[in-house]
């Protein structure tokens, strides 16, 4: 990867900029500063026709991913996880042919000082310095992914279901069987044996889906939405970028999860995208 620092507020990657090699541990930043990273990737045969993701550890408060010049996702630092989501891995494609070539640009923002929004609180002044570590293309292991979320869901259900619930009792029995099947660390055995145990435990978890609520139970349906503040702790130009990061991320989520729906409730914010990020605006219109 290569990197280039700038104070310019740009809508696309700088052309003919003085990029330098991005070395692990490289320091960049300062208040109101941006750092652009760029790299290339060609899909090998072994990764053809499967979902591919980009994992970027470049520092910065928030970053926007461009794939072949089109805004395509957001990255945020772990410290923002509770309030803004910890976006550390973005979808590149749900599957493409071998030898497909991609150009990636990342616009990372160091951030700026905000004195606080509460009358008795004054935020300290940070140095706004960040470190580059890596940009990697990765794949998702579907076996572990499915097992992790099923296990987490049923474990959480034991905490909220009535203590006398027969369903809760069956979940606990199943979790005990899972405990007896899986290896608690990949280091305890070889990869094939570890994954085989996960698959066997998944069969036990899948059985729990046969238990349904009664016809009187309510149905909960979810829809995505993002509260976009206009010029709150930042000037208008940062609102534009926040919208671009957020909306491009929603389009990628829709690509990964076709059933997902997102409500964009501000025509002004859509207008911002039309003016500053027309390729993103085109994708937004297509998704309606």
Q: Can you describe what each PLM-predicted range is?
A:
Residues 1-288:
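Carbohydrate-active enzymes and regulators
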């Amino acid at each position: 990867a290569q990197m280039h620092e700038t104070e310019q507020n740009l809508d696309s990657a700088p052309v003919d900029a003085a990029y330098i090699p991005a070395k692990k541990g490289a320091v960049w930043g300062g208040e109101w500063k941006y750092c652009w990273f760029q790299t290339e990737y060609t899909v090998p045969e072994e990764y053809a026709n499967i979902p591919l993701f980009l994992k970027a550890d470049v520092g910065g408060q928030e970053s926007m991913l461009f794939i072949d010049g089109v805004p395509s996702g957001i990255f945020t630092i772990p410290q923002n996880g509770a309030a803004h989501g910890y976006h550390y891995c973005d979808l590149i494609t749900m599957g493409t042919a071998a030898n497909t070539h991609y150009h990636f640009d990342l616009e990372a923002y160091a951030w700026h000082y905000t004195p606080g929004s509460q009358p008795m609180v004054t935020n300290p002044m940070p140095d706004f310095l960040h470190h580059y570590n890596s940009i990697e293309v990765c794949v998702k292991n579907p076996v572990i992914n499915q097992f992790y979320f099923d296990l987490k869901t049923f474990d959480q259900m034991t905490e909220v279901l009535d203590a006398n619930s027969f369903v809760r009792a069956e979940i606990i029995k199943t979790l005990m069987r899972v405990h007896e099947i899986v290896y608690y660390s990949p280091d305890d055995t070889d990869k094939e044996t570890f994954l085989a145990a996960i698959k066997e435990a998944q069969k036990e978890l899948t059985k729990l889906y046969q238990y349904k609520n009664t016809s009187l139970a309510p149905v909960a349906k979810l829809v995505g939405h993002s509260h976009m503040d206009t010029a709150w702790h930042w000037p208008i130009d940062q609102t534009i970028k926040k919208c671009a990061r957020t909306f491009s991320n929603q389009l990628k989520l829709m690509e990964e999860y076709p059933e997902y729906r997102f409500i964009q409730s501000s025509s002004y914010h859509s207008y911002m995208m039309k003016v500053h990020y027309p390729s993103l605006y085109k994708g937004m219109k297509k998704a309606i």
